[in-house]
């Protein structure tokens, strides 16, 4: 249950400022390590500010969703939600300058497939990237290198409660106990679109899955000219519990505001930032910072393989047409 979960205890925050604060701290920590290297000036030229890191993350979150939606065989929504949550959690405490979101994104999806028991082989997985066999092998090698780090940085909290299951539950409940809405299925398409927009925001770090699911249904109904507030008072028995009702409505209001004010990263901005990010990950800069522990904790015994040379690295274009 969500209310007893590690998600609620460790990964759900009371304020929108908390995820922002953690991202800034991750950026500051990494830039401090850059300044301590032999080439601080060279490294600082290409360093990213916190808001620039956020733009990069937004770009790769969208690519993550596109990859999952285009995946063959069809990927369950729960896997998409879990992967997106992993990605957001990882970059609360890590900088994109240290761990490139291109590979972290794929590692999040790969791990989510396992945790949510979506049975695809590693060959099937990388086959969705539109790469040649040699390229697929290189990408899979990197995914497997990063998998342990990802699990560590998630504090081994791998179970994610997504809004998709409660959404289906509420929809069934509306069908059986709310005759005022003749055909609740008419809400599904718009509600799915709302949940896709929610996935790009920090909502999963701020709201319970049930609140997100209920907001998807009621806001979709509202846009269709349907008032379902009586569903809350009658079917959910909140008529005599004004405090809970008020708290729920306030949460739904804040969630809708969060979704409405979301702004995707601008393509021209991302293009420039990606060039600087690639410089951050160039051999001359990264080796002096990370050494042998490039992909692991600084204080544990996990030693990664030697970083790939520049000619071995793969780019966003290696995703092919799958996105």
UniProtKB/Swiss-Prot annotation:
Residues 310-323 have a biased composition (Acidic residues). The gene is ccnh. It comes from Xenopus laevis. Regulates CDK7, the catalytic subunit of the CDK-activating kinase (CAK) enzymatic complex. CAK activates the cyclin-associated kinases CDK1, CDK2, CDK4 and CDK6 by threonine phosphorylation. CAK complexed to the core-TFIIH basal transcription factor activates RNA polymerase II by serine phosphorylation of the repetitive C-terminal domain (CTD) of its large subunit (POLR2A), allowing its escape from the promoter and elongation of the transcripts. Involved in cell cycle control and in RNA transcription by RNA polymerase II. Its expression and activity are constant throughout the cell cycle. One of its GO terms (molecular function) is cyclin-dependent protein serine/threonine kinase regulator activity. Its main location: nucleus. It is found in: Nucleus. The lineage of its organism: Eukaryota, Metazoa, Chordata, Craniata, Vertebrata. One of its GO terms (cellular component) is nucleus. InterPro entries: Cyclin-like_dom (IPR013763), Cyclin-like_sf (IPR036915), Cyclin/Ssn8 (IPR043198), Cyclin_C_2 (IPR031658), Cyclin_N (IPR006671), CyclinH/Ccl1 (IPR027081). NCBIfam families: ccl1 (TIGR00569). This is Cyclin-H. Keywords: Cell cycle, Cyclin, Nucleus, Phosphoprotein, Transcription, Transcription regulation. The keyword Nucleus applies. The keyword Protease does not apply. Belongs to the cyclin family. Cyclin C subfamily. One of its GO terms (biological process) is regulation of transcription by RNA polymerase II. Residues 296-323 are annotated as: Disordered. PANTHER family: CYCLIN.
């Amino acid at each position: 249950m969500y209310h007893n979960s590690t998600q609620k205890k460790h990964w759900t925050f009371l304020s929108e400022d908390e995820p922002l604060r953690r991202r800034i701290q991750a950026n500051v920590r990494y830039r401090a390590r850059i300044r301590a290297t032999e080439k601080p000036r060279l490294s600082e030229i290409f360093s990213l500010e916190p808001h620039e890191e956020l733009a990069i993350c937004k770009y790769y979150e969208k690519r993550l969703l596109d990859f999952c939606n285009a995946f063959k065989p069809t990927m369950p929504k729960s896997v998409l939600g879990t992967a997106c949550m992993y990605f957001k959690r990882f970059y609360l405490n890590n900088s994109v300058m240290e761990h490139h979101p291109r590979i972290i994104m794929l590692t999040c999806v790969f791990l989510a497939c396992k945790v949510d028991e979506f049975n695809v082989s590693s060959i099937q997985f990388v086959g969705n990237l539109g790469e040649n066999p040699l390229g697929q092998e290189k990408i899979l090698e990197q995914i497997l290198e990063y998998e342990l780090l990802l699990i560590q940085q998630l504090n081994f909290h791998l179970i994610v409660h997504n809004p998709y299951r409660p959404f289906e539950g509420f929809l069934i409940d509306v069908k059986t106990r709310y005759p005022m809405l003749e055909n609740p299925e008419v809400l599904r398409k718009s509600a799915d679109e709302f949940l896709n927009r929610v996935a790009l925001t920090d909502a999963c770090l701020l709201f319970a899955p049930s609140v997100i699911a209920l907001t998807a249904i009621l806001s979709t109904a509202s846009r269709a000219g349907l008032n379902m507030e009586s569903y809350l008072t009658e079917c959910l028995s909140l008529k005599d519990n004004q405090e809970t009702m008020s708290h729920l409505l306030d949460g739904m209001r804040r969630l809708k505001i969060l979704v409405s004010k979301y702004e995707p990263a601008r393509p021209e901005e991302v293009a420039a930032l990606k060039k600087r990010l690639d410089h951050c990950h160039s051999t001359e800069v990264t080796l002096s910072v990370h050494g042998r522990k490039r992909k692991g904790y600084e204080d544990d015994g996990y030693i990664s393989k030697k970083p790939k040379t520049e000619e071995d690295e793969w780019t966003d274009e290696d995703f092919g047409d799958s996105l």
